[in-house]
């Protein structure tokens, strides 16, 4: 099977649909991570930046405010098309978007000063090959800065679903490179350091970042519940439950979220990621 074919199928189908439909809400929900990423990446007006797994373009367009040029790469055509529309509407001329698999894409060597990524580097079926390919696209003194999720247990916004599911079904252990591509593939800092070292990076640092996020960027209770349960990982967790029990799981989740709901604000939940930096 060609590299990342399963990921390409997913992100050009059901996985992308929810992100495209709710792009603005995802941007607001993830804003703390975007700010942390760009602060750690640093700002330089002469930088040429590569944004891998750029999705609908929020981080690419934000980076373009201070960079010479930013190229966003994603294998999802629907998300890249949305990112291009956003750039046109915002009249941001120094951002461009490419539909490509960063694991195998033929980057011009030494093109980019900086790699950034917001939750876009966990889905490679050959991570060493992917990070090596990306490193070759960086200049000899290039840098990398990205964010990736910590484990399921550290993310309240998903654990409340997992806890409800466990009342009816067993859940496997999630996370780690040994389990293949997925949301939690890079949840272990020791594995991140080893992986990046194998790909030729050094001076790797993994710093914990645990903000409170506003689920769906705010909204009423019903909308927030629907938004959460429509996402890829929540749907995956619900998939472990027999269909006859799913309504009960949803009721439990609704009750948990109702307890956390703030009128006029929305639902605040704890999240956890690693902010990773490295030298090419």
Which residues fall in each region the model found?
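C-terminal helical/coil "lid" or tail adjacent to the Rossmann-like core of SAM-dependent
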Residues: 3-8, 15-22, 205-263
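A short acidic, Gly/Pro-enriched loop at the edge of an enzyme's catalytic core
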Residues: 103-114
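Helix-to-beta-strand junctions that scaffold the AdoMet/dcAdoMet cofactor pocket
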Residues: 124-125, 138-140
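Core SAM-dependent methyltransferase catalytic element
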Residues: 199-202, 224, 273-280
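Conserved catalytic/acceptor-binding region of the Class I
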Residues: 26, 128, 143-217
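Class I SAM-dependent methyltransferase SAM/SAH-binding core
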Residues: 48-105, 129
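Conserved class I S-adenosyl-L-methionine
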Residues: 1-47, 58-62, 79-82, 86-90
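A short SAM/SAH-binding and catalytic strip from SAM-dependent methyltransferases
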Residues: 113-127, 150
């Amino acid at each position: 099977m060609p590299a990342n074919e399963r990921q390409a199928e997913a992100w050009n189908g059901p996985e992308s649909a929810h992100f495209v439909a709710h792009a603005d809400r995802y941007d607001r929900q993830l804003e703390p991570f975007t700010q942390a990423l760009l602060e750690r990446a640093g700002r330089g007006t002469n930088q040429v930046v590569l944004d891998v797994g750029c999705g609908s373009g929020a981080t690419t367009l934000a980076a373009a405010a201070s960079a010479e040029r930013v190229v966003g790469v994603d294998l999802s055509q629907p998300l890249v098309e949305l990112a291009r529309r956003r750039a046109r509407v915002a009249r941001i001329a120094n951002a461009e978007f490419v539909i490509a698999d960063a694991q195998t894409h033929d980057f011009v060597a030494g093109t980019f000063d900086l790699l950034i990524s917001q939750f876009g580097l966990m889905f490679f079926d050959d991570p060493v090959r992917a990070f090596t390919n990306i490193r070759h696209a960086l200049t000899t003194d290039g840098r990398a800065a990205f964010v990736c999720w910590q484990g399921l247990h550290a993310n309240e916004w998903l654990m409340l679903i997992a806890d409800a599911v466990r009342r009816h079904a067993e859940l496997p252990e999630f996370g780690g490179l040994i389990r293949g591509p997925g949301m939690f593939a890079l949840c272990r800092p020791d594995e991140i350091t080893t992986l990046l070292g194998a790909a030729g990076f050094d001076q790797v640092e993994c710093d914990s970042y645990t903000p409170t996020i506003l689920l769906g960027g705010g909204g009423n209770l019903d909308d927030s519940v629907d938004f959460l349960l429509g996402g890829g990982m929540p749907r995956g967790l619900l998939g472990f439950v027999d269909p006859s029990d799913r309504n009960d799981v949803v009721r439990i989740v609704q009750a948990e979220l109702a307890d956390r709901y703030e009128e006029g604000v929305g639902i605040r939940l704890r999240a956890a990621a690693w902010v990773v930096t490295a030298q090419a």
